Amino acid sequence: MTGLNTAGSDRDYDTQSLNRELQDKGFLLTTTEDLINWARTGSLHWMTFGLACCAVEMMHTSMPRYDVERFGVAPRASPRQSDVMIVAGTLTNKMAPALRKVYDQMPEPRYVISMGSCANGGGYYHYSYSVVRGCDRIVPVDIYVPGCPPTAEALLYGILQLQRKIRRTGTITR
């Protein structure tokens, strides 16, 4: 082991021992980035971009049976107040610039969930001349939720996967 590797492992050991001592006294030792990610996962605000029948399932997720707000996710009507955009339904060539414009209005960090076969890859209308073959050609997508239409449980699982992804990745990089 080189001196550089030894110094790094000693530092980790010192941090772990200090963390154990502080936990016994009721304190928490963490990084600012972990704290920010923890807060961000518990307060995601999603904006709907419902274009077709998948939007109905998106509404079911907000209803009392599934109650997505218990996970800290709440709907917002304005892109300037939202962190997550859920694209649900068939995206046409005519609607693509509007999707990009709304995405650009969202503050950083912003996340996109593509919901349903039509948003993921064009779906049933894949070979139509006027359909975009996946919203990932217009905006970067973080989570894909498959199905036609996907169930509310599938969307809920996708939201939980997004929260896990936010916890795993840093605040600077996406």
From Swiss-Prot:
[4Fe-4S] cluster binds at residues 53-54, 118, 148. It is an enzyme of class 7 (translocase). It catalyses: a quinone + NADH + 5 H(+)(in) = a quinol + NAD(+) + 4 H(+)(out). The gene is nuoB1. Keywords: 4Fe-4S, Cell inner membrane, Cell membrane, Iron, Iron-sulfur, Membrane, Metal-binding, NAD, Quinone, Translocase, Transport, Ubiquinone. Belongs to the complex I 20 kDa subunit family. PANTHER family: NADH DEHYDROGENASE (PTHR11995), NADH DEHYDROGENASE [UBIQUINONE] IRON-SULFUR PROTEIN 7, MITOCHONDRIAL (PTHR11995:SF14). GO terms for cellular component: plasma membrane; respiratory chain complex I. NDH-1 shuttles electrons from NADH, via FMN and iron-sulfur (Fe-S) centers, to quinones in the respiratory chain. The immediate electron acceptor for the enzyme in this species is believed to be ubiquinone. Couples the redox reaction to proton translocation (for every two electrons transferred, four hydrogen ions are translocated across the cytoplasmic membrane), and thus conserves the redox energy in a proton gradient. Its main location: membrane. Binds 1 [4Fe-4S] cluster. NDH-1 is composed of 14 different subunits. Subunits NuoB, C, D, E, F, and G constitute the peripheral sector of the complex. It is a peripheral membrane protein. The keyword NAD applies. It is found in: Cell inner membrane. One of its GO terms (biological process) is aerobic respiration. This is NADH-quinone oxidoreductase subunit B 1. Its cofactor is [4Fe-4S] cluster. GO terms for molecular function: 4 iron, 4 sulfur cluster binding; iron ion binding; NADH dehydrogenase (ubiquinone) activity; NADH:ubiquinone reductase (non-electrogenic) activity; quinone binding. Its EC number is 7.1.1.-. The keyword Nuclease does not apply.
